[in-house]
């Protein structure tokens, strides 16, 4: 059984704003397992930051239960409220590192002093603190920049220092709240790859809050989509990308734009006669499970012709995932058998109604 490191149950966070109740987080439950890189995505104001601030009780919930590494930090029921004692919460918080969009480094201190600062509370000798800080800088690829000042570093390098500092107390969990939002594309990719490496090498569990689906696509294994204080859809990265149900998810993952492009092509496509012997299919598949021989096979075995209207390939973590919109022409029975064949070969098949083409 995978070990649950974060268990949020029925969390609500309500704020009072000008006499009105703002439901920033509304009855959200979320479990994160050891070694996950759990992407929490949604537009600004969806409640992502508020939800993750609950994990280490930087934000106290209005209702719900917070368990980290098996220990209950907070539980509020109708009858009572239980909160972990302050002296126990402090070390618990150290199990959870955080990085943000703003790096929050101390400008007047050198890079290594910034990292050492996070180790000061430990009963370590000066020398040990310096050695540990140096080790952390090496881990994030900045072993030779310890004597520089933050202003002398690029944004990406400053975020690396912030990551080294967040790891100073050997946390099991790292919360990344929009950590790449202020970075250019190159630095964004480098920071995401660093998080992926730390996840792999240190078995660090990462909660990745972002409004950028590309970030999630690159490193997350699981995704929760938030809208108006609630999780509207969740699943493995592959599920969310190949089988999104909620309109916002479709928009975020690009299914909506793929579908719009395919429909625009179909409207002007003479191969599509809108006849009773034709189906429009939306296929998604992993790796290279669909290739030329498949269309040949469908023709030979089921007497259906498959013509590709639109295709796109995304890379999820390291796996290519393809999207195809095809017109399948042939007898109803043959088309049904061909669809069964595709499904049996790990292809997700969705029939697109003809209305979609007419009304789009
Ligand atoms: N301390 C607070 N007091 C009052 N309202 C708050 C407070 N913190 C957050 N909110 C409100 O709660 C809602 C959710 O905010 P939150 O920051 O969690 O969203 P988000 O999805 O992280 O978006 P962003 O990326 O813009 O921060 C917003 O409407 C915000 O204005």
What are these regions (language model features)?
Residues 72-75, 116, 120, 127-144:
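Conserved ABC ATPase "signature" region
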Residues 148-151, 168-169:
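Conserved signature/switch motifs of ABC ATPase nucleotide-binding domains
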Residues 56:
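Helix-to-loop junction immediately C-terminal to a conserved catalytic motif
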Residues 73-97, 121, 240-244:
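ABC ATPase NBD coupling module
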Residues 41-43:
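The feature captures the beta-strand-to-loop junction immediately N-terminal to the Walker
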Residues 216-218:
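A short, surface-exposed alpha-helical micro-motif characterized by mixed small hydrophobic
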